[in-house]
Amino acid sequence: MAARVPSGEARRSASGAPVRRQVTIVRIYLDGVYGIGKSTTGRVMASAASGGSPTLYFPEPMAYWRTLFEADVISGIYDTQNRKQQGDLAADDAASITAHYQSRFTTPYLILHDHTFGLFGGDSLQRGTRPDLTVVFDRHPVASAVCFPAARYLIGDMSMCALIAMVATLPREPQGGNIVVTTLNVDEHVRRLRTRARIGEQIDMKLIATLRNVYSMLANTSNFLRSGRVWRDGWGELPLSCETYKHRATQMDAFQERESPELSDTLFAMFKTPELLDDRGVILEVHAWALDALMLKLRNLSVFCADLSGTPRQCAATVESLIPLMSSTLSDSESASSLERAARTFNAEMGV
């Protein structure tokens, strides 16, 4: 966190009752493949005012994953894949364990989202409105509920059944959400991963390649929905998501962000799979409802991309330069103070 958030009462009403000061909030979710530098960028943004406004930072819930409970989920999910590859764990058992660990990644994000989403206010403002407060989150729930499970599914570490179950937990985003998908060239990405050498974490190039593609799909999904289209547009002509599709999705940068994407460039394409279709090749209604829900939950998210190849300060400046393009909401000073308290508590409890 940087400077204190806007607080106090701006004026009193005609009756003499205090009127809460209005506060314009920009909220940013830094996301992307692990090890790029988003956490460092978020901390730097919080160490000084972003665009002149106070900045709060909510870090990754590392303690929740590693020390608060009996199992370290980061070490556990990688160890599960190692045991499968060594023949010590059957593929079906490994898939079930992987899904369990992936759900553990999601829990703290869902809790945090539930606690904070009502504090941002419901009135969306014109893009370019100067914020009174910038709130930076280290990942959105879409990371652990959709993107990472999707990558695990495409690799073969999780089933479609488990993926759909995870996707269903994604909370609906209120107006004003901004995701910045952080990117980096592959060589520098690997160098940074080796430098940080996080305990239990592995440099899994297949997972990294797949995640890069999935995050491109996320950006394309946002662009697709922003154009006014829905997942049913072009569904009939979309080919099945078969082993060829999965193989392509694991190849480095096989998917790229597109300003005018087709349905095949989006996250929705991977769900046209036999497990979700009837004997005629028609998607079952219950699964169609799941895709409807996913579409509604993603619709209020604006997705941006930012290259983090510079110094930490340069990376923070890159993200800050996007703020005039971002959505913002109108809240009040009491909610802003609640966000400040929440950020202070989350930082204190989630550090390891």
UniProtKB/Swiss-Prot annotation:
| Catalysed reaction equations from the record | thymidine + ATP = dTMP + ADP + H(+)
> InterPro entries of this UniProt entry?
Herpes_TK, P-loop_NTPase
SUPFAM superfamilies associated with the record: P-loop containing nucleoside triphosphate hydrolases (SSF52540)
From what superkingdom does this record's organism come? Answer: Viruses
Keyword Transit peptide assigned to the entry: answer is no
Q: Has keyword GTP-binding?
A: no
The residues that the entry says bind substrate are 78, 102, 198
Q: Which GO terms describe its biological process?
A: DNA biosynthetic process; TMP biosynthetic process
In short, the EC number is 2.7.1.21
GO MF annotation: an example: ATP binding
Active site at: 60 (proton acceptor)
One Pfam family assigned to this protein is Herpes_TK
Where, in this chain's numbering, is ATP bound? 32-39, 192
Keywords on this record? ATP-binding, DNA synthesis, Early protein, Kinase, Nucleotide-binding, Transferase
Q: By its UniProt entry, which HAMAP family does this protein fall under?
A: HSV_KITH
Which family does the entry's similarity section mention?
Belongs to the herpesviridae thymidine kinase family.
Q: How does it assemble?
A: Homodimer.
Q: What does this protein do?
A: Catalyzes the transfer of the gamma-phospho group of ATP to thymidine to generate dTMP in the salvage pathway of pyrimidine synthesis. The dTMP serves as a substrate for DNA polymerase during viral DNA replication. Allows the virus to be reactivated and to grow in non-proliferative cells lacking a high concentration of phosphorylated nucleic acid precursors.
* Listed name of the protein: Thymidine kinase
GN (gene name): TK
